[in-house]
Swiss-Prot record:
Identification of the protein by name: Mu-conotoxin MrVIA
Family per record: Belongs to the conotoxin O1 superfamily.
InterPro entries for the chain: Conotoxin
Localisation: Secreted
One Pfam family recorded for the sequence: Conotoxin
Signal peptide region: 1-22
Tissues where this protein is expressed: Expressed by the venom duct.
Cysteine disulfide links: C53-C71, C60-C76, C70-C81
Annotated keywords: Calcium channel impairing toxin, Disulfide bond, Ion channel impairing toxin, Knottin, Neurotoxin, Secreted, Signal, Toxin, Voltage-gated sodium channel impairing toxin
Species in which this protein is naturally found: Conus marmoreus
The UniProt record lists the keyword Disulfide bond: yes
Swiss-Prot/TrEMBL domain comment: The presence of a 'disulfide through disulfide knot' structurally defines this protein as a knottin.
Amino acid sequence: MKLTCMMIVAVLFLTAWTLVMADDSNNGLANHFSKSRDEMEDPEASKLEKRACRKKWEYCIVPIIGFIYCCPGLICGPFVCV
């Protein structure tokens, strides 16, 4: 029981230490979430929004299995976008 409490205290201390000592080029841990999506410099930079898509007659994998999708307006037929 004492060992568990000591481990919890140690983890909390190390987490706090990491946050305090984090190097931030903007002089501190400033409001990371204060800007709205419209105010961001490059909202298109998100990797989630930039998915590679395959053109017509290019190889594709069924979306349930893989991460290669056909471009909008096309569907993944038997291993090719049509």
